[in-house]
Amino acid sequence: MLIATRNEGKTKEFRAIFDKLGYDVENLNDYPDLPEVAETGMTFEENARLKAETISQLTGKMVLADDSGLKVDVLGGLPGVWSARFAGVGATDRENNAKLLHELAMVFELKDRSAQFHTTLVVASPNKESLVVEADWSGYINFEPKGENGFGYDPLFLVGETGESSAELTLEEKNSQSHRALAVKKLLEVFPSWQSKPSL
């Protein structure tokens, strides 16, 4: 299974899930000659499809791509598909987190800072209709970062009503409940029947 990312944090989460199923997980760092796929889509699904289908065509392999992001209700769903570059192209996690806190500076009640981490997964294979699943993980945006684990907006994302940030969860805890874990769970329910479908 080739994961269409160079992000080792994301790969680690997928590897923890797919290892148990007997899949050997690679990522784009194993294929340095592959071109970068521009994420020009306006939705998570468009971006995930672009990555999965382009890389599958180039390599002839089964490819899993995800497009994930944070949707903050009071910001109309932003940062959304721009989550990784919310503070600008090439922005660090710290810069994106600072920008988000700045955007929410006048939102004083935690209940008004509701948000969802969203994942769309697309599996593409040569000559097959792509498989698409989506999932959300609901919570709130904290007033300051806390926790040392995870990546991205994890230090700001309070999980449900627990008061814990997703950066305070162990990888095992996160993989049992995160948006990515929920999407993978859905994927695993439909993957066997998709895999057994004849090619186009």
Curated annotation (Swiss-Prot):
It is an enzyme of class 3 (hydrolase). GO terms for biological process: nucleoside triphosphate catabolic process; nucleotide metabolic process; purine nucleoside triphosphate catabolic process. One of its GO terms (molecular function) is nucleoside triphosphate diphosphatase activity. The active site is at residue 67. InterPro entries: dITP/XTP_pyrophosphatase (IPR020922), ITPase-like_fam (IPR029001), RdgB/HAM1 (IPR002637). Its EC number is 3.6.1.66. Pyrophosphatase that catalyzes the hydrolysis of nucleoside triphosphates to their monophosphate derivatives, with a high preference for the non-canonical purine nucleotides XTP (xanthosine triphosphate), dITP (deoxyinosine triphosphate) and ITP. Seems to function as a house-cleaning enzyme that removes non-canonical purine nucleotides from the nucleotide pool, thus preventing their incorporation into DNA/RNA and avoiding chromosomal lesions. This is dITP/XTP pyrophosphatase. It comes from Streptococcus pneumoniae (strain ATCC BAA-255 / R6).
